[in-house]
Regions:
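Phosphate/pyrophosphate-binding active-site segments
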Residues: 2-88, 186
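Thiamine diphosphate
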Residues: 25-36, 92-200
Length: 200
């Protein structure tokens, strides 16, 4: 199922004629079930090496979504944990870090916003020996800004990077997905974060 039930649009992601097979019951060890499935499919025992797509001739210049992604991927330490709620601004960081040092990437799986900073707190509390990087969009960061206080109070090893575009960029996309092609000034103002501007 898709995470939003858009009026007049299909919510099922799989084709209607697809046969859905249950791999394992809740009481079954999921790792064992996945291993047996991999054996049945003759899947490789080790994951494929991911090609490093990071440009090698990167030069300093204007900070953009693309250059931020390159910088993050180049400076990310081994075994980092990334809490990614960067919305429309963080795609380059995900793409370029795929071939970088070993790390874990935690990202939103549904349609809610506001989980990025609390997830970073949880990761840092659970894994105090690992660097946590919070990639956070400015709009969704406002939902749980109190997590910044918790990070400071608990002296957590979290690098927080705010991707600031002064907009609920992801909600603008969702507006178009429900068929609103020419939103009025009131609708646009609800998704604009520049009046007043956020001084992160």
């Amino acid at each position: 199922m898709a995470f939003f039930a858009y009026p007049g649009k299909e919510s099922w992601i799989s084709p209607k004629n697809a046969k859905l097979v249950e791999l394992a019951k809740v009481s079954i060890d999921p790792e064992d079930a996945l291993r047996r499935l991999a054996d049945e499919l003759d899947a490789p025992s080790l994951p494929a090496n991911v090609q490093d797509e990071t440009p090698t001739n990167f030069e300093c210049g204007k900070l953009t979504r693309e250059s931020a992604g390159i910088i993050i991927s180049k400076l990310m330490p081994e075994n980092a944990i990334v809490s990614d709620e960067s919305g429309t601004s963080g795609g380059a960081a995900f793409r370029y870090s795929a071939g970088g040092p070993k790390h874990d990437w935690l990202m939103i799986t549904g349609g809610a916003i506001g989980q990025g900073l609390p997830v970073a707190v949880g990761a840092a509390v659970a894994c105090r020996d690992r660097k946590v990087i919070a990639l956070q969009a400015d709009g969704s960061g406002m939902y749980t800004v109190q997590a910044l206080w918790t990070m400071a109070r608990e002296n957590l090893d979290i690098l927080t990077i705010i991707m600031k575009n002064n907009s609920y960029g992801i909600l603008n996309i969702e507006l178009s997905r429900v068929g609103v092609t020419h939103p009025g000034p009131k609708a646009l103002s609800l998704l604009d974060l520049s009046n007043p501007t956020l001084n992160w």
